[in-house]
Every structure is written in C-alpha cells, then in structure tokens.
Amino acid sequence: MSQLQVRHDWKREEIEALFALPMNDLLFKAHSIHREEYDPNEVQISRLLSIKTGACPEDCKYCPQSARYDTGLEKERLLAMETVLTEARSAKAAGASRFCMGAAWRNPKDKDMPYLKQMVQEVKALGMETCMTLGMLSAEQANELAEAGLDYYNHNLDTSPEYYGDVITTRTYQNRLDTLSHVRASGMKVCSGGIVGMGEKATDRAGLLQQLANLPQHPDSVPINMLVKVAGTPFEKLDDLDPLEFVRTIAVARILMPLSRVRLSAGRENMSDELQAMCFFAGANSIFYGCKLLTTPNPEESDDMGLFRRLGLRPEQGAAASIDDEQAVLAKAAAYQDKASAQFYDAAAL
C-alpha cells in the first residue's frame, strides 16, 4: 500500500529548493514517488477536440483563438453532434480512453447548456471518459454538467499569481480559482495545470505548482504545457525555454501532487523523443493523442505509438462499450440533424 503523504501547505521556498536540486537527484526523487502510486510504463491517453473554434473575447497573449489577434484562424460554429461522435469513435479506436471537448468561450451561455449536456451523455455512451473546457463556469452550470455525467472539467491557472497579469487581463486569477471550486463542489474531477515558456521566471513556475498543490484537493489531472508560439499573438517572439527546465517542472509537479495524473500536454510536436522520454521518467503519465490540440499541432498517432514501443510504454485501458451501444448513439446523433436550425446557431459569434 502506498505510504505517500499528500500535502496542501507547500511553501514557495520549499518548491524552489526542489527545482534547484541536481537533475539526477530531482529525477530520482520524482521517479521513486511516481512508482509508489502508478505503473511507470502505463500512460493515459486523451483526445482533445475543438467543438467551437476562434472568436474568443479574452486577451490571453498565448492564444491564437483570441479575437483580439490576427492569427489567420477562421472561426467555426459549434460542431454538429454527429461530427463530435465520429471524432470520439475515432479517438477510441486509436486507443484514447478520455475524450476532451473544448470551446473558445469566456463562459458558456445558458442556451448552450442543453446541447453540451447531451454531447456529454452521447460520448459517455461510447464507453469513454469525458472532459470539457468551456471557460469560466457558474456553480449552477458546474452542477448541470456534473448531473449530465461529465467526468472532468479543465480550467488552467496558466501561471503564478504574480506573473498572471502579464499574460491575461480579461479575467482574474480569482475567477479561475472560483471555477475550480465550483467544479470540485459539483462532484466532477478537476483538470488544471498551466503553461511554461511564456517569459516567466523560475519562481513563477514554482508559484504555479504551489497554487495547484495547495488547493483543498489536488487536481486529478495536471496538464503541463510548453508554449506553442503562434504568429500574430503577443508571445510569438519569446525566447524558447530550456527544455531541461520543462523536465524539472514535470518532476516537481509529480513530487508535489503524487496522486495526480501529470499530463505532457501542448508543445510535444517540438520536443525530441529523448526529451519526452525524460518527462515520462520524471512522472508524466498522460498525453493528448492526435495530430492537433484544439488549433495547435501535435505528433501523429503513429509517431506516438512508435515512441511508446521504443520506450516499452503502453496505453492505459479505458472502459468499453458494445457495438450495439455505439450504433445506437450514432443513430441518436443523426436525429439531431433535423433540429439544426434550433441548435446549430453560430456559437462563434461574439
């Protein structure tokens, strides 16, 4: 039985001291903790789909979906149910156990909720875990999604409280914490992490992890993203982060949150196989699978499976649904096409 101690009282200087450890010592500590709770050769696989793209009113300086920046991204309306389910079935066939759906909104409108809840129910009927990232949620909206059966809700803190104002001004850090509180209170599992390589200092990376680790309950899933620099965004010309600092961030996240899934998230397309292997050793045990994460590139499935074979890793097995269940879900989705005028409004409009 695991003897790991889970803490929620980490001090900044303690975390900075972990970051400052010699790399071999840090990796040994992180990997030892990882083995206490998880099979080190098993990786949970998620697929992320943008169900509504672009025209977001927020000013996140890293994001190509903001309406404030000219990135050449074409806005798209909320996807039809059948399209979402086709993508979900493809993800499951490729080995994903969780299907994540993201919408470029500040927050979902009440008129969106019935359709979003139905989307959750139909994807779950395929035998997959479900996750959504839709922006800020009210307590009522969180409860609605939980009642519909949504397993996870993603809402990242992005960076430390001190650096946050240099990244985004259209919502506060407390707004983000409030959404996480609503999600946890609803009974859903929390997915929350951040982005590194945004020009922050090492103390900010420590500060981000401090905020996550000192939540009343650790996030169930902690995605750590490397900034993907997109032309047209304010962060397009930032200097690259030292890849070893990314590995350190993964390792410290594993130490601080020993029971959480640590997800090697955006930026893998620009990472070497050797860097990813170090991240898996440091405690990363989840990835996004598929050639695109919302609007940014990601390694091809065949590349990931090739890397898994070389490293002796295997995908975590998820729940299964029968063929009859899947066919019933697709039949129900087709029926939604008859309601297009009522439900497929232009959700990309500001």
UniProtKB/Swiss-Prot annotation:
Cofactor stoichiometry and binding remark: Binds 1 [4Fe-4S] cluster. The cluster is coordinated with 3 cysteines and an exchangeable S-adenosyl-L-methionine. Binds 1 [2Fe-2S] cluster. The cluster is coordinated with 3 cysteines and 1 arginine.
Binding-site residues for [2Fe-2S] cluster, renumbered to this chain: 100, 131, 191, 263
Disulfide bonds: none
Cofactor: [4Fe-4S] cluster; [2Fe-2S] cluster
Residue positions binding [4Fe-4S] cluster: 56, 60, 63
Presence of the UniProt keyword S-adenosyl-L-methionine in the record: yes
Chain's role: Catalyzes the conversion of dethiobiotin (DTB) to biotin by the insertion of a sulfur atom into dethiobiotin via a radical-based mechanism.
Subunit structure: Homodimer.
Record protein name field: Biotin synthase
Protein source organism: Shewanella oneidensis (strain ATCC 700550 / JCM 31522 / CIP 106686 / LMG 19005 / NCIMB 14063 / MR-1)
Lineage: Bacteria, Pseudomonadati, Pseudomonadota, Gammaproteobacteria, Alteromonadales
Gene this chain is encoded by: bioB
